[in-house]
């Protein structure tokens, strides 16, 4: 039986009693700069505006997952069948080192790369998460950018197949669909002096192609996009990565343009940006002590550590949850309950059950 956790999850916005209040204006806007949060439920918009007003222009930052949090659907999971259907990415053209297990072919059916990816996920997330980024190795970034733009403009679903109970099953995969609400939130945060970072379990370079391209509206600085980083091989045969270039202080517009000619390799940089690695990435690339005033996600296992460890609740920080699956909602509710118990047991400030905003994907369009 599911444990009773009504006190934790029934409220859209749960506020610590010790959190100082900010007087709310009649319109709930707090005199903030940037776009209004028109594509948000009223209560959620009010909570977000209140938090932004309290933390504006004070050295704070927010972190967001990308797939299914900042836009609807998954970039890698749709780009893979899209390129396979075009004949651009196939088992014959993929790096041979990425054939981790045999393909599941039959006399009448050749397994798709999408199906292969799903079977790797059945083994372990730690197998398929990196593979989903590595599979795009061998492509120059400029070529991949062209395909990503094609995919983002593609107004149809992408047909592919996978195995379900050992039977070949047809399916349709949706390309990413921009959440207008998140575009508003990103830009309102930045307009009020709060930096925005993306911390994604997807390929950093692929995510950057959307998050940092002005035509998609997010306007995230390229250096603020953190994801699964793969080494790039330049035309001179040298290896590098955006993360190294940023650390070395050479990630200029000129360097970014040169990177478009560099080829993605299958070699991974660390830390790996999924599960606890998301929190590790924040500590490594953003700040060891200044915690985010907002952390947003949609997948309990992958985003949970960043959300629970990260949010500065003492400053009114928000745990933002895009509530896309009943099973995931039940799982995150259970994590809230268990983490609250654990914090109390250890005599720590209880933050796990404070300041949650839950929003459905349909409410962000």
Predicted features and spans:
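A metal-dependent, Asp-based hydrolase signature
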Residues: 75-79, 83-84, 89-173
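Mobile, glycine-rich extracellular loop/lid and propeptide segments
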Residues: 71
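C-terminal cap/substrate-recognition subdomain and adjoining C-terminal extension
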Residues: 24-37, 42-43, 59, 146-197, ...
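Short, compositionally biased low-complexity segments
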Residues: 21-25, 114-124, 251-255
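Non-catalytic pre-domain segments flanking phosphatase-related domains
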Residues: 3-15, 20-66, 74-100
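Short, flexible, glycine/charge-rich loop motifs used to bind or transfer phosphoryl groups or to couple energy/partner
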Residues: 51-53, 68, 215, 284
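A generic alpha-helix surface/boundary motif
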Residues: 74, 126-127, 205, 276
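Active-site flanking residues adjacent to catalytic metal/cofactor-binding acidic residues
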Residues: 64, 68, 296-298
